[in-house]
Amino acid sequence: MADVEDRAAKGISDYDQGGVKTTELERKIEDMENKNQELTRENRELKERLERLTGEIEEMKDVEAEMNQRFGEMEKEIEEYEEEKKALEAISTRAVELETEVSNLHDDLITSLNGVDKTAEEVAELKKALAEIVEKLEGCEKEAEGLRKDRAEVEKRVRDLERKIGVLEVREMEEKSKKLRSEEEMREIDDEKKREIEELQKTVIVLNLELVKNVEELKKWKSKKKLTEEALSETQKREKELELKKDELLKKVEEGNKTVFALNERTMKPSNGVRDTNGGDQKGSLEAEYQWPVVAAGSVGAAGLVAATFFVCYSKLR
């Protein structure tokens, strides 16, 4: 009977171990599902970051196109200033020529005045020529004055243009420097973005592969969990049947013990109910000694049968 109880306790212990194993499977499946959700979230964040980087690259390209357009406009404006500068230089040259002509007229006038002692005709002619020269001189002076004003204005405009050209040249140099820096930065940013995009794409591929692997492993663990739960359910069912059989066997053992005890009591009594004072005591004692081993052997056999039956049932259960 003690052996039966030990085997029953061992069966309950194995059932507890099966429950622990099921708990470990459930925990591992839960960890796999959490990891799967984490990988899905990281994949979504990487896609959003890739879209944001692509938008930044497009904005950089728009800025570069706008800067190229501004450089074209500045070059056109510089060409217009160069043409206007050439026209002003031509006006300045004409003013110098007029000043030379006025100087020559003054020399002619002085020469004419020095010949006043000549004849009257010559004087008249000289006066006439002088009047013409004076008139022409006045016209030349007026023209020269106008040219001087024009020259001053032209020089002023030339200085303004030179200043503007200097400013534009400085701005052009700055813009070219900025353009070079921008192009260099754009190349660096573009290369960096490309490298980052390639790394992100590789990371996305790795995460997708790991996600597929985890999904397959999750399916495998779920299938294993289902098989374990089915086996556990079958074990619980068999255990209940075994408990019922054990209770029945224990009842039978208890009834057998009661029967053995009753038989022992009956065996210890005289066979005819009367003690023989002479040979009867010896005969009754022999009969009692003969019946007692038979009853004991029957009790031991019943207990052995019960233990063997329980052992076979328990072995089938395992």
From Swiss-Prot:
Q: Which domain of life is it from?
A: Eukaryota
Give TM segment ranges: 292-312
Instruction: List every stretch annotated Disordered.
Output: 1-39
Q: How does it sit in the membrane?
A: Single-pass membrane protein
**Location(s) in or outside the cell:** Peroxisome membrane; Mitochondrion outer membrane
Task: List the residue ranges forming a coiled coil, or say none.
Answer: 19-260
In this entry, the parts of the chain located on the Mitochondrial intermembrane side of the membrane are 313-318
List GO molecular-function terms, semicolon-separated: protein homodimerization activity
Q: Does the keyword RNA-binding apply?
A: no
**Disulfides per UniProt:** none
What does UniProt give as GO cellular component?
cytosol; mitochondrial membrane; mitochondrial outer membrane; mitochondrion; peroxisomal membrane; peroxisome
Q: What GO biological process terms are annotated to this protein in UniProt?
A: mitochondrion organization; peroxisome organization
Keyword list (alphabetical) reads: Coiled coil, Membrane, Mitochondrion, Mitochondrion outer membrane, Peroxisome, Peroxisome biogenesis, Transmembrane, Transmembrane helix
Report biased composition (Basic and acidic residues) as residue ranges: 23-39
Q: What does this protein do?
A: Involved in morphogenesis and proliferation of peroxisomes and mitochondria, independently from the previously defined pathway controlled by the FIS1-DRP3 complex.
The annotated subunit structure for this chain is: Homodimer. Interacts with PMD2.
UniProt protein name: Peroxisomal and mitochondrial division factor 1
The record lists the lineage as: Eukaryota, Viridiplantae, Streptophyta, Embryophyta, Tracheophyta
